[in-house]
Amino acid sequence: MIFSRKQLKHLRRDAKNALLFGWHAPRAAERIFIAPSAVVTYAQRSPSRSDTGRVLSGNWDLQVKPLDEHPKVRYCINRFVRGQSWEEAGAIEHAKKLLDKRGSADGRRSWAEISRRLEEIDKLYSELKETRRLKTSAEFLNQASSREDSGVYIHIDRFGRPIFGGKGCHRFAICKILDIPVIPAQLGLVHEQAASSKKALRKLRHDTRE
């Protein structure tokens, strides 16, 4: 079997964590299941999926902001709760700032691409409103995999509480707005205190979606 560079990185992190924390250790790109209602903050740390399953000590988990201050969450609330247009909601202004700063917004480099992206988000809202079930990455890609690459990104703080990690913003915001009980997510950073606890991740590893 030939592994990709990403797979090898995941396996190395899994092995390191297992040596340090035992069989219950966090795993890279691990699929967890969280209640969107339990997530009330987002990390100030710049989001990076390369941190997935990484165990980190220190006070990074205290450097958070209220979730409703996240720009993408805020404009999704304006769009889907208050019924505003994307422009009124602030999505266009946010995209313009990203284009000016980085040359792209969510990987889109033109206004035509951004417009199509916003249409896709509208469709996702309609779909999730009807099904009330967010697919795992494996379900979406029709693959047999226990990893949750590209999922809603969730860090775990020292007390085992979820922190939004800044990836999968629109999916996560819509699920929270619709009050969907449980969704799949990709494990991000895990505080060392939580990694040392057998209970911290155990309850997040069971798929309780209906």
Model region roles, listed by residue range:
Residues 4, 8, 66, 88, ...:
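Intrinsic-disorder-associated interaction segments
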Residues 8, 16, 73, 91-92, ...:
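Short amphipathic alpha-helical segments that mediate assembly, nucleic-acid/protein binding
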Residues 15-18, 22, 26, 84, ...:
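Short, flexible helical or helix-coil boundary motifs
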